[in-house]
Regions:
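Ligand-binding cleft/hinge of the Venus flytrap
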Residues: 1, 68-114, 215
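N-terminal hydrophobic or amphipathic helices and topogenic motifs
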Residues: 1-13, 65, 83, 189-233
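Short helix-initiation/N-cap motifs at beta->coil->alpha
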Residues: 1-19, 107-123
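A ligand-binding cleft/hinge motif common to bilobed small-molecule-binding domains
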Residues: 13-24, 32-38, 122-150, 155
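Periplasmic-binding protein-like
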Residues: 39-52, 139-182
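A conserved helix-loop-strand patch within extracytoplasmic ligand-binding domains
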Residues: 40-87, 183-187
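Hydrophobic multi-pass inner-membrane translocation pores used for secretion
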Residues: 120-121, 131-134, 156-157, 161-163, ...
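Structured C-terminal subdomain patch of bacterial secreted/periplasmic proteins
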Residues: 155, 167-210
Length: 233
């Protein structure tokens, strides 16, 4: 096992930020009126988006894994898989930063990284990979009964969704509504949005956002919509 650093400053914070930006680039989009001034942060999501290392129940039991640091010294014989945007082919810099964090902070140096899979969950379920890095809100973690490894030391990057814009162009009601939306984006809210935009029949981001806003009572449903009494989720 590798002696892991304790209490070190996050010297690779810019690189970790690159990992998050790359991961979210394909899942989010910006909209609005262009502004002459630089945008400012208006509100952040209540829930945290973080990468999470997951394994099957069989792998967790065989290697006695509970925490990501339990992988220390055990990754050399394992194959790992990351989300498609974080592969070396898609973004070499982000992939290098992510692998360096795993090596330095968790002592995990997988023998192989899968390079051509579009579905990391399916790869780990089929034992093509033994460790998958997924967003913690990925609904497939529970659906496939995968085991998320604890990460109290924040080895893997995390962050929040942030609404940006010009406060000077917004009235109090608009700012309040933005804050309401971001407050509803807690862990469950983020998981619901991810369920709508992933899977076998994903919705386009704008359509998924509309369904989510209507379900949370943050937008009126169009007249031709059928809205269930409970929730779509």
């Amino acid at each position: 096992p590798t002696a892991l650093p304790v209490g070190d400053p996050a010297a690779d914070a810019p690189a970790a930020g690159r990992v998050l930006e790359t991961l979210l680039a394909g899942q989010t989009s910006a909209a609005g009126t262009p502004q002459d001034e630089a945008p400012a942060a208006l509100s952040s999501s209540a829930g945290v988006l973080r990468l999470t290392a997951v394994v099957t129940q069989t792998t967790a039991a065989r290697l006695e894994l509970e925490s990501i640091t339990d992988l220390n010294g055990r990754c050399e014989s394992l194959t790992a898989v990351a989300p498609p945007p974080l592969t070396a082919a898609a973004d070499p810099d982000a992939a290098t930063a992510l692998r360096a964090r795993l090596d330095r902070l968790a002592g995990c140096r997988p023998e192989t990284w899968l390079a051509d899979t579009e579905d990391p969950t399916a790869a780990v379920v089929a034992d093509e990979a033994q460790v998958a890095l997924l967003t913690g809100t990925d609904p497939e973690i529970d659906a496939s009964t995968l085991v998320p490894l604890e990460d109290d030391g924040r080895v893997l990057p995390e962050g929040r969704l942030t609404a940006v814009g010009s406060a000077a162009t917004l009235d109090d009601d608009a700012e309040r509504r933005i804050a309401e939306v971001m407050s509803a984006l807690d862990g469950d809210g983020l998981r619901e949005l991810e369920r709508l935009t992933t899977g076998d029949d994903p919705l386009p981001p704008a359509e998924a956002a509309q369904y989510w806003l209507v379900d949370h009572g943050l937008e009126d449903a169009p007249e031709d919509w059928f809205v269930p009494r409970g929730s779509w989720f």
